[in-house]
Amino acid sequence: MKRVLAVFFTIMFMLGTDTFLISPLLPTLQQVYHVSTELSGWMVSSYALGYAGFALIAGPISDGLNRKKLMVLGMSFFALSTFLCGMAPSFLWMLTFRFLAGVSAAFVSPQVWASIPLLIEKKQIVKAIGIATAGLSISQILGLPIGAYLATIHYTTPFFVIGILSALLVVLIYVVLPEIQPVHIGGSKTNILKRYKQLLTDSKVSLSYFAYFVFQTGNFAAFSFFGVWLSIQFGLQVHEIGTAMLVLGLGNLTGNIFGPRIVNKIGYNLSFYGGIVFTAVLYVLLPHVKNIIFVELLFFVLFFVTGILFVLMMGRLQNMSSIARGTGAALANASMYIGQMIGAAIAGMLFAASHNFILVGSFTALLYIGALFLFRKSEKLSEDSETGIAS
């Protein structure tokens, strides 16, 4: 189990590093390609668009295929497309290669979440999800700032390094992971639309996924323009932005690790709903902080709580379907990346209009509160359903 989890951790680390890498590089890439602030956000959104669009297809398809083979194939194309980002001669080519990297990642990430319940003992599933999530967090702590430091050599260097390391990871996946055959139900195959219909017919399930989408839209609206904000308001260079992001990632990882203990101590509702309200308030306050030390302190606290929330949300969504886990994992990931695409695009317009982080922070806070009400409505429907069955 340890070797399998190590591979899952490494996969999420590589995907996370590539996903989050663009944020601290945006000011540099904006100058390289001579594009406006509004357009620069599409270097984030193009990856998200490729991921979101194809995750919706990849998830249901993967429920009928060998997940190991999909991971090998997807990671191979991910390595190639990321490497090519470093060779992009123009803004449009960069968008194209980022889009293809997102498409490739769409065939890999859902397999990790869907394979955990199949390969890991039931009592260890939450822990395993936390370990995989920690891969994303550590990509912010180490991968993201290291990428920013590599960019001081040349802005293309991080893409080349990630591409080569991802190619080596393909070999590790092939050697370590067992064959993960599909679970056939009733001997018949279900088409893609029917899989989503089966999953989303239940209103409490569809509400939860929509709430997750709303939350991630707000999350990535803020995250995508942290680098631009730090560059403009505090005059930070790319490696200094990477250091600031290190603090952010450290908070996320700490939340992933200590989250289960905190939830057990203070209860699910306070951890989940209280955490959403708390982060919403901090996003409103963040733009008004003028000292970079206090900004980094708020980064740590914000993403410490977000790290807890992410584990709780993924556990909640994965428990909603024991049959179409690939479809559910794909829908969760697609929701996140569609949110990233829309959030980054809107944040670009808001930041360009205000030239500060106030509108972006308020937008994120508003969406967090909206997500809270949607999650609570979903939970209420679930409680009503259980009451009806009991009676």
Where are these regions (language model features)?
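Helix-breaking motifs and short loop linkers at transmembrane-helix boundaries and internal kinks
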Residues: 34, 66, 87-93, 104, ...
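Conserved MFS/SLC helix-loop-helix module at the cytosolic interface between two early adjacent transmembrane helices
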Residues: 53-89
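Paired small-residue
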Residues: 77, 81, 92-100, 293-301
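Cytoplasmic helix-loop-helix junction between adjacent transmembrane helices
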Residues: 97-138
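Helix-loop-helix hairpin linking two adjacent transmembrane segments in secondary transporters
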Residues: 131-174
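Juxtamembrane intracellular "pre-TM" segments in multi-pass secondary transporters
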Residues: 178-208
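C-terminal transmembrane helical hairpin of 12-TM major facilitator-type secondary transporters
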Residues: 269-313
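A late C-terminal transmembrane helix in Major Facilitator Superfamily
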Residues: 320-354
